[in-house]
């Protein structure tokens, strides 16, 4: 049984898994595709826009600008960049504040995320077997995969 189950091995799923692993949790990361981060390779026209140093509530035009203020205060761009730097990713900031990997390719972002995950023995990675059901009982989540396997 894992402390944390993460559904989806995209950028957010890998970041969530790494955050839990960094905090000492055992993690099961489940990705329906055969490989992690496939969609990441197309972000930012293949360059992978990591964050924007000029992001702020004044640039947010949704119905709840207070959410943007709260979210940015919880995890500012500088923290995102520092986190990627701990994994060895070098970045470049454009004049408009958009931040990309120095290589200008999303592959380098995916490579550092995958390498960071691979360092943890407390990670169980399941790919190519989509989740068909999630149940919660007595404080335990059980994910049933299309293959019939159950993960807790």
PLM regions and their residue ranges:
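A conserved short coil-to-beta-strand element within the FAD-binding core of flavoproteins
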Residues: 127-140
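Conserved Rossmann-like nucleotide-cofactor binding loop
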Residues: 12, 35, 46
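Short, conserved active-site loop motifs that form the nucleotide-linked donor/cofactor pocket
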Residues: 122-124
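Short beta-strand to alpha-helix junction loop
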Residues: 68-78, 95-115, 126
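Glycine-rich active-site loop/strand segments that organize a redox cofactor
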Residues: 45-96
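N-terminal Rossmann-like FAD-binding beta1-loop-alpha1 element of flavoenzymes
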Residues: 2-29
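Core beta-strand elements of the Rossmann-like FAD/NAD(P) dinucleotide-binding domain
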Residues: 2, 146-152
């Amino acid at each position: 049984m894992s402390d944390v189950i993460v559904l989806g091995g995209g950028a957010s799923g890998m970041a969530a898994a790494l955050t839990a692993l960094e905090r000492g949790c055992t993690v099961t990361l489940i990705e329906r595709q055969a490989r992690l981060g496939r969609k990441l390779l197309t972000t930012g026209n293949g360059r992978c826009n990591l964050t924007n140093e000029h992001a702020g509530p004044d640039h947010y035009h949704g119905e709840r600008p207070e959410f943007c203020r709260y979210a940015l205060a919880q995890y500012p761009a500088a923290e995102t960049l520092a986190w990627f730097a701990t994994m060895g990713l070098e970045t470049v900031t454009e004049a408009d504040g958009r931040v990309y990997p120095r290589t200008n390719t999303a592959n380098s972002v995916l490579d550092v995320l995958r390498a960071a995950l691979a360092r943890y023995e407390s990670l169980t990675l399941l790919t190519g077997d989509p989740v068909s059901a999630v149940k919660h009982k007595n404080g335990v989540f059980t994910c049933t995969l299309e293959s019939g396997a159950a993960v807790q």
